[in-house]
């Protein structure tokens, strides 16, 4: 894939250091479950994996009603750190610098809404500055269901900082082509 990874006969010959960045415990829902499952699969294949999830995912003003959190204990088999604050630009810089210092081979980001673009874009741009880390995006939606005037510039900012994509549908693939020529 990116020089330090060789895939032969279904086995990885080099152990990768991977940071999964996105929803995970204590956040509820399918996105968190998917990210935890992906982390477990990479671990099963022998890679070193950490999940960086949110200290603040959405401000409570944007998440009225139900809780964002599950009421169960954290999984014992995953290293989950609550480090990302999506509404604090100083935090984005700190997380990006931390990743740049830690030099993971891959940061795998989950992207589903342009609301995350400023945060994820800043983190990705800073983390990639070490010349080692590659940012891969597992993307559910490019264009949100409810459109806002900032969607296109936010998407352009984040998607331009990504080295490769895993998309969830042909529609998303088509939408991605309007923003980037990165591998998909």
Regions found by a protein language model. Give the residues of each.
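Short N-terminal targeting/anchoring amphipathic segment
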Residues: 81-87, 94-118, 133-136
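Extreme N-terminal starter segment of soluble prokaryotic enzymes
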Residues: 15-19
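Nucleotide-sugar donor phosphate/pyrophosphate-binding loop at the beta->alpha transition
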Residues: 131-136, 141-161
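Helix N-cap/beta->alpha junction signal
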Residues: 111, 141, 169-170
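A short, glycine/small-residue-rich beta-strand->loop->alpha-helix junction that serves as a flexible
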Residues: 22-36, 59, 112-117, 146
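N-terminal strand-loop element at the rim of the active site
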Residues: 25-28, 40-101, 172, 177
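A short, active-site helix/loop in glycosyltransferases that binds the activated sugar's phosphate group
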Residues: 160-184
């Amino acid at each position: 894939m990116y020089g330090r990874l060789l895939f032969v006969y279904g086995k990885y010959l080099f152990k990768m250091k991977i940071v999964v960045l996105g929803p995970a415990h204590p956040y509820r829902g399918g996105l968190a479950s998917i990210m935890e499952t992906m982390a477990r699969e990479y671990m099963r294949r022998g890679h070193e994996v950490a999940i960086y999830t949110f200290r603040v995912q959405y401000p409570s003003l944007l998440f009225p009603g139900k809780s964002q959190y599950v009421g169960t204990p954290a999984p014992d088999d995953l290293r989950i750190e609550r480090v990302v604050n999506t509404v604090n630009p100083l935090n984005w810089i700190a997380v990006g610098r931390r990743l740049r210092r830690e030099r993971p081979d891959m940061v795998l980001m989950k992207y589903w809404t342009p609301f995350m673009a400023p945060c994820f874009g800043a983190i990705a741009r800073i983390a990639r500055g070490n010349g080692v880390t590659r940012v891969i995006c597992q993307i559910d939606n490019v264009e949100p269901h409810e459109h806002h005037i900032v969607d296109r510039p936010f998407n352009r900012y984040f998607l331009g900082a990504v080295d490769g994509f895993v998309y969830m549908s042909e529609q998303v693939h088509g939408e991605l082509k309007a923003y980037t020529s990165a591998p998909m």
